[in-house]
Design a protein with these regions (language model features):
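Positively charged, small/polar-rich N-terminal and surface patches that mediate targeting and assembly
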Residues: 1-120
Length: 120
């Protein structure tokens, strides 16, 4: 099993959830996050006004609102899920996000005690 963590643009969360659900991956965790990449934050993505004084501050970190989703899938499903995440979220512009694939030792469904892939 693998955990797939994706950091994506806020306006891409709905189409991402829909695409994953259609493919049979309806379960995921999503949360609002702030972050920045190598560009130290792209203010053009932010939909609220940022004061000119703040924009002029050299060396200040500008964190950008993003969404983080996490889902655990069987090893054989990783290429499909990653491909869908790329297809839905790639704009070709700075700020498209990142995808991380991490190993998962065990999964347990608390309600039933099911383990491994049965718990997914």
């Amino acid at each position: 099993m693998k955990e797939i963590i994706a950091i994506i643009r806020p306006n891409k969360i709905a189409p991402t959830k829909e695409a994953l659900s259609v493919l049979g991956f309806p379960g995921l965790t999503a949360c609002k996050v702030l972050g920045r990449g190598k560009q130290k934050g792209i203010l053009g993505e932010v939909t609220f006004n940022v004061s000119p004084e703040l924009q002029k501050q050299e060396g200040s970190m500008k964190y950008v609102p993003k969404r983080m989703i996490s889902l655990v899938v069987a090893d054989e499903d990783v290429p499909l899920v990653v491909a869908v995440l790329i297809k839905i979220n790639r704009t070709g512009k700075v700020g498209d996000g990142r995808i991380f694939v991490c190993p998962v030792e065990e999964a347990v469904r608390i309600r039933t005690g099911e383990r491994g892939q049965a718990a997914l």
